[in-house]
Amino acid sequence: MNDKRVFNHVENNAGNEEEVFRVKREFSETAEIIPDLTALDDEREEKQALEGELLASQFEQAVRPRFRWWKRAVIAVAVLFLGATVAQSVQWLIDTWQANQWIYFAFAVVGCSVVGLGLSALGREFLRLRKLRQHLALRAESAVEFKDDFEIDKAKKLCGEITSSLGMDAQHPTVIQWQKQLNDGLTAREVGELFSKNVLYPIDNKAKKLITQSAVENGIVVAISPLAIVDMLFLAWRNTRLINRIANIYGIELGYWSRLRLMRMVFINMAFTGATELVQDIGLDWLSQDITAKLSGRIGQGLGVGLLTARLGIKTMEFCRPLTFNKDEKPRLSHIHRELLTSLKSVVLRSDKSRKKQNV
């Protein structure tokens, strides 16, 4: 009799693989597609970082222009001319004194005084320009030093140099408050952030208030004034004064040439950024403001001039600040445009009502 044979079924053989079933996906034609904007935000942040580095390099090129051979030749000729003028003035003074020609001696004294005043003015301009270059170098160094992989001692030393450039000593209340928050567990970047929040934050608020005040005043004057030439001259004077006052807030004393170079960099930066940054700063609120501005041409003019003044002040503030702004610290036009629009509407509409009453 044959033996019974039993066959066992092996489910997981080396030659047989288990078939995997997946859930069927169905797509609706009317379903709303919500894109993932995370990649776009990251790309925008990278673009802003690259743009900031580009603007910093442009500012450095504006303050430190390249010396070409013809510039060196002009400087050499100017130095020789000044030296010859000083030598001739001194020689004229000595000759008239020895010859007892008192009238010519008086003219020689006046000439030497004028030459001395000119040399002192040139010396002050050179010192102010040098201070602006030192501020630029300090700002560029702070952009590199305040990173996680740098030493804390270097970051603290750099903060001390920035404090000295701002005209503060170690006993200043904000500096003492910053020093109390320091400990060995902090990184260089965190040291810079604490310094910015404690020491630079009050200075930033002062500059922001000045920018808002200037923007509102310029917008109101342009909205009320009927003369375009007067508006242009007024804005040129006010904007130049705004740049000087912001620079003084951050401890920078501008001379003639340093002021021209700073203004040049600010205007170049404003031209490069253009309307794109303006729309990003203001956002969708611009649409409602535009509709309101269409109700009155004067409100529209005042709004445009006020925003231009505010943008000029913000760019000057960015270049004069010894530390670069973080993403949350950077001032934006959206912080100013509401107050500007409210002030313009109240002033212009009030003037319109008064004129109607006078006509009646």
Curated annotation (Swiss-Prot):
It is found in: Cell inner membrane. InterPro entries: DUF697 (IPR021147), UPF0283 (IPR006507). Its main location: membrane. The chain crosses the membrane at residues 74-94, 102-122, 215-235. One of its GO terms (cellular component) is plasma membrane. The keyword Signal does not apply. Belongs to the UPF0283 family. This is UPF0283 membrane protein Asuc_0957.
